[in-house]
Amino acid sequence: MKITLASGSPRRAKILEELGVEFDVVKTDAPEASYPHDPERTVRENALAKGAAAAPRTRVLSADTIVWFGGRIYGKPRDLEDAKEFLRELSGKVHTVFTGVAFDGDVKVARSDVKFRRLSDADIEEYVARVRPTDRAGAYDIDESGDLIVESYTGSYENIMGLPTEPLREWGIA
């Protein structure tokens, strides 16, 4: 089954490619909602909005990922200084990654917990030099030099990357 991925995320495209899913990419400019005390609602509504923005196409897959810690939503950082601040705040702590995934109007939410290593300023500088942190929620990518900052995680690795695979299997996509 061929689908439309309503996302410009290279990590989401990589996951679909690894699963052997045939897809086209459509980038959308849907406005993003933010409910700091309700991360599940945030990702659910954003995933649905991105899918709706790709209409009138059918078989549209869309997703939204956030990092949630201390009652705060960490989306994509504005710039490198913002990214470094995110990493400092998450250093040595456990945070939660939420991804809302929508397919043809149905939406599912995945949750994973991630513990960061204690990061020195040098660790943070090395990480941001290796990874472009400004295009990813929470300023990090577990799949790209994640070993520098991630100590452990529970839940779906693919969810932390931005596209949990369990809903894709439920919908018969993968």
Please name every model-derived segment:
Residues 1-4, 36-174:
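Anionic-ligand binding patches
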Residues 12, 32-34, 169:
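Flexible, glycine-rich phosphate/dinucleotide-binding loops
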Residues 23-32:
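A short beta-strand-loop structural module common to alpha/beta enzyme folds
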